[in-house]
Regions:
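Short glycine-rich, low-complexity segments
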Residues: 1-39, 43, 47-72
Length: 72
């Protein structure tokens, strides 16, 4: 039961963090678990994906592939 509570808190923190990045239109660097580095502005997200608008394209990234989101 405790694990469920911690998981819910973690998801709320994740949502709040990504929401703030979207609302501020912050430039971010996203590192994937494969080591690939992506830069852009997060425009939307749901439970399993993040949409990143880069300089010349928009990418749909699955959250399980994300290692780190770093505001620039």
């Amino acid at each position: 039961m405790l694990d469920n509570t911690l998981e819910n808190i973690s998801k709320l923190n994740e949502s709040d963090f990504i929401d703030s990045l979207i609302n501020e239109a912050r430039l971010v660097t996203i590192f994937l678990v494969s080591g690939i580095k992506l830069e852009g502005i997060i425009t939307s997200f749901d439970t399993s994906t993040v949409t990143l608008r880069g300089s010349n394209n928009t990418q749909l990234i699955y959250k399980h592939a994300i290692s780190t989101i770093l505001p620039v």
